[in-house]
Amino acid sequence: MDIKTFAKEHFEEYQALICKLTSIPAPSHHEERRAAFICEYLHQLGYGQAFIDDAKNVICEIKGSDLEAPVHIFMAHTDTVFPDETEIPVIVEDGCIKASGVGDDTTNVCAILMTLKYLSEKQIVPKQTMVFALNSFEEGLGNLKGCRALV
């Protein structure tokens, strides 16, 4: 199955994942619950090597078959700009997900998670080593702390 077919067949799962992750509050400096959910999700996919670093980034590295090839890094941030930690209502209407933070950047986090699901299910070993980083502290006073911790 190619990735386009996979995406079509798993679209409802992708939407449900977006709704679930969006409902977990994650203001900068308080991403612990969202990071824990993501890391556990990756472990359930078979990525036991996924971990949360000291900067609250969730990191999952997949070794490539050619260790001399350049490493590719894919990132999306887990925090939201909203300062409080109250539950965020999520509304699905006419196939559209409406919620604070869903487009910045929760949908992209979920796209990375679904990509990792595809790679796991298809047992794909990439040529290049791939690092998937769901980084923290991107918004506002977070000042890209998660990104800077990665480099």
Role assignments for model-derived ranges:
Residues 2-98:
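Acidic/His- and Gly-rich active-site-bordering loop/insert found
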